[in-house]
Amino acid sequence: EDINYQLAQNDDKTAIFEGWCDFLNYFDASIRFQFSFLNLYGGHDAMEQSILVPLRGDAFDEIRAEYSGMLKTQLAKGNNGLKKTRYITFGIEADSYRVAKQRLERIELDILHNFKQLGVAAAPLSGKDRLRLMHAIFRMGSSEEAFRFDWKLLPATGLSTKNFIAPSSFEFRNGRWFRMGKRFGAVSFLSILAPELNDRMLADFLDIQSSLIVSMHIQSIDQNEAIKAIKRKITDLDRMKIEEQKKAVRSGYDMDIIPSDLATYGGEAKSLLKELQSRNERMFLVTFLIVNTGETKQQLENDAFQAAGIAQKYN
C-alpha cells in the first residue's frame, strides 16, 4: 500500500488520503489509539524461511524453486534484513470487564472492516503474538535470544509473562539515552510547528536503515469541546488584535498593521472552526515519538541526527 500511494497520480493520492481521513474520523473521544511503525532486524534466516514457496511434488516445483531463488536474491540485496511492520493499538474505559470486552470486540470488527475498505490487510494479535512482539521490541529484533513461551509454564513455574519478554537489563542513568540489554536507545518527540506536514515525512523516517520505532499516540477530542476550544482561541486572538490596534493608535501609526503571527493564527483558527462545523471533521491531540537504537553510542547519535534532519526538512 505504501508503494501504491507513492506511485499513484495526484487524484488517486487525494482519494487514498480522504479514505484515511474517514478511517480516523471513526474514532470518537472515548477511544484512545496509537499507530506504531516498527523497523526491526528480524534475523536473516527467519526472513528467508518466511518468503520461501514450499514445494508440492508436482510439475510446478521447478517454477516454485525459481521464484524462491529470485525472492532470496532480492532479500540479499534489499533491506539488509530489516523487517517493517505496522500496528494499531486501541483502548477504552468501561465500568466492568464484561462491558469493556464486548465493546472492544465490536471496535475491533469495525476497524478490520474499515481497513478492508481501504484495501489494507490486517489481522488481530493473540496474547502470545503480543508477547512475541514485545520480546522483539525489547531486543530491537536481535536474534541472540529466541522467544520461548507457553501459557502452561506460568502456573508450573510461578513466573509472570514479564519474565519471558524482559531484556537482561534496563539502564536509565543518562537523560539523553538509555540502555536496553546490549543496545543503546533514545526517544525523541516531534514538535509540529508547520501548518501542514508533507505526506513524505513518515515514509522518510521509515526509510532510515536501522532499528527504530515511530509511534503516534492519538486522542480524539469531543466535537463540542473542540469547537468551544477553537472559539475561545479565536476570542483570545481577537482580544490580542484589539490591544495591538490600541497600541497602534496611541503610537500614531496605522491600526490595520498588526503582527503577522496574529493574522496567520487567526486565519488558521477560523479555517479549523469551519472544518469542524461544516465538514464534520474531528480534532485530535497527537504525540509523535521516534525511538532510535544502536549497538554503540556513536551509531545511536548518527541515527538520531538523521531523524532530526528529516524532521527539520518537513517541519
Q: What function would you assign to each model-found segment?
A:
Residues 1-315:
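Extended, folded cores of ATP/NTP-driven motor/assembly subunits in large transport
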